[in-house]
């Protein structure tokens, strides 16, 4: 089950960095502002921040992804997923490296729940399977909040067409052979409300967090992460976003 923080309605922004697409959801959790970034690297690589330790209640600077997933279609109704769980100080602790933890990180729940339990407390599995084995686009009513879905579909169609034309698929590396820098993360800053529109305020904080990442993306990986963490801490202390 998701933490209570996930129930908070956030301010969403989308960013494109080559074949890397980022959905930034910024939520207020009491006196904290939680910036969570879901990442998609086309065509089929996804990751976000922590799965179990993420609730927006504790300060965190550039916490990293706790799961990394590749999903490959088999046919129009089935797909195969290859997923890695990543444990560490900046993600989920190693105590979740169990069979139950593996099931929960992938499906949002343990797999042996009864039908009644799934109906009372639905998880990721019910959200996905409830749509059926294939998405019927004609029956959809897309909203502004579905911008990420629309971007993804548009870019996938473009990539498929380019591949059919014999063009080399684009790669996420900045330089051939270098480690791919990713952006999926959780950042939690202590920023109490101020005397103006809090929705606009927290959105500006999310934008400021992303700008720090983008400004430093050409640095070597270790240097980049350390610099991002320092910049986030400095920004929180200064109160300037």
Task: Give each language-model segment a name.
Residues 1-241:
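C-terminal catalytic domain of Rieske-type non-heme iron oxygenases
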């Amino acid at each position: 089950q998701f933490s209570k923080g996930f129930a908070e309605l956030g301010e969403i922004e989308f960013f494109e960095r080559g074949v890397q697409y980022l959905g930034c959801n910024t939520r207020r959790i009491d006196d904290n502002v939680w910036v969570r970034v879901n990442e998609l690297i086309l065509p089929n690589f996804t990751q976000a921040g922590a799965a179990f330790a993420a609730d927006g209640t504790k300060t965190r600077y550039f916490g990293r992804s706790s799961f990394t997933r590749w999903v490959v279609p088999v046919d129009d109704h089935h797909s195969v997923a290859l997923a890695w769980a990543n444990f560490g100080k900046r993600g989920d602790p190693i105590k979740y490296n169990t069979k139950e933890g593996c099931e929960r990180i992938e499906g949002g729940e343990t797999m042996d729940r009864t039908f009644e339990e799934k109906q009372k407390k639905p998880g990721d599995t019910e959200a996905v399977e409830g749509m059926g084995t294939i998405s019927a686009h004609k029956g959809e009513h897309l909203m502004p909040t579905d911008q990420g879905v629309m971007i993804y579909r548009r870019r996938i169609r473009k990539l498929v067409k380019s591949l059919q034309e014999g063009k080399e698929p684009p790669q996420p590396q900045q330089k051939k052979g270098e480690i791919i820098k990713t952006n999926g993360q959780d950042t939690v800053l202590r920023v109490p409300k101020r005397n103006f529109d809090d929705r606009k305020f927290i959105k500006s904080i999310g934008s400021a967090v992303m700008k720090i990442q983008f400004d430093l993306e050409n640095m070597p990986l270790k240097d980049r992460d350390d610099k991002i963490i320092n910049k986030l801490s400095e920004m929180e202390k200064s109160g300037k976003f």
